[in-house]
Amino acid sequence: MTRKVAIYGKGGIGKSTTTQNTAAALAYFHDKKVFTHGCDPKADSTRLILGGKPEETLMDMVRDKGAEKITNDDVIKKGFLDIQCVESGGPEPGVGCAGRGVITAIDLMEENGAYTDDLDFVFFDDLGDVVCGGFAMPIRDGKAQEVYIVASGEMMAIYAANNICKGLVKYAKQSAVGLGGIICNSRKVDGERESVEEFTAAIGTKMIHFVPRDNIVQKAEFNKKTVTEFAPEENQAKEYGELARKIIENDEFVIPKPLTMDQLEDMVVKYGIAD
């Protein structure tokens, strides 16, 4: 059965990098068949897998051809180890609603049977916090059953993760979606592992993996590749392989218990995150 996973987190935290490196590790180290659906108007959710951004997004094609004329072959691109990729894209700058574009794109992919039964994983790489109904669609309408939040030990990353948990609580009962854990994408701040572990325990989940900071990630990105494709022998590739393994084996999905603002402030003060 295909597992459908939504990835959320604060803007700039490294969601797309983490998602693509995890997808590559699933394919390379664990022989999994993966589909990555980018739900960000920037259309940068698949560039490391494809070796560059696609020339046209799904929404570009909808505007040019009309949704009824679009086929899977038009929009699905294959990259590293045959990982399938789609970028939703968005409206023209200053016009329309990007969240609405996500809804249109996912609906169209489902209507066209893009998420085939032979896939092991479908990833939805979502824009930032759950700030509007469109970007919340993967969890709101049950498109994804599993959610992982990318965070770090930085104050705003923790705040964003807590807000995302509030959105999960709102939609969990109607869509049967659960939080699989927090992925700590390290920024090398003081007490990072401890603060994220305390936060995850407080909201009723776990830190599924601590991804260390390593310059090899940036080197791979400069070459438009995931770490696994660029340097599979490096320790960082093995870290993503371990994260992939934990996701494969994970069977604990919860409705989180978001913290109050006072509880968050207390934790921030305790770990000096606000310094």
From Swiss-Prot:
Further comment found in the protein's record: This subunit is associated with the iron-iron nitrogenase component 2 (the third type of nitrogenase).
GO molecular function ontology, one term from the record: ATP binding
Modified residues (ADP-ribosylarginine): R100
Protein family membership: Belongs to the NifH/BchL/ChlL family.
BP terms from Gene Ontology: nitrogen fixation
The protein's name in its UniProt record: Nitrogenase iron protein 3
InterPro entries: NifH/chlL_CS, NifH/frxC, Nitrogenase_Fe_NifH, P-loop_NTPase
